């Protein structure tokens, strides 16, 4: 247990150290340079794969577009989280009502179908 914790902690520390070293946590110019370097390194591999695929692969987004998309989806996530928190009492009330109704249905004795069609033959 302790060994597993130490291994996981070491992996997290190594990941943070490596990402700091390559510039992910640096200023925006450093991150832009890293993004463009990765993009240029992947370009030959992507071109080789494009020839083998039966469909066209879209281009990677530009840096400014990537920033916009990251901000947009982050903001959408925050808004949806707060919308869920705002609606939580309503959801909880509906859920509790549904549970109450279900237990009331279970508490009632089953209805016996009467009539000539349901009586056993003699």
Swiss-Prot record:
Membrane topology, from the record: Single-pass membrane protein
Protein name according to UniProt: MICOS complex subunit MIC13 homolog QIL1
Keywords, comma-separated and alphabetical: Membrane, Mitochondrion, Mitochondrion inner membrane, Transmembrane, Transmembrane helix
Subcellular location: Mitochondrion inner membrane
Subunit structure: Component of the mitochondrial contact site and cristae organizing system (MICOS) complex.
Keyword Membrane tagged: yes
Membrane-crossing residue ranges in chain numbering: 9-25
UniProt function note: Component of the MICOS complex, a large protein complex of the mitochondrial inner membrane that plays crucial roles in the maintenance of crista junctions, inner membrane architecture, and formation of contact sites to the outer membrane.
Family membership noted in the UniProt record: Belongs to the MICOS complex subunit Mic13 family.
InterPro entries the UniProt entry points to: Mic13 (IPR026769)
GO CC terms: MICOS complex; mitochondrial crista junction
Gene Ontology biological process: cristae formation; regulation of cristae formation
Main location per the UniProt record: mitochondrion
Keyword Membrane: yes
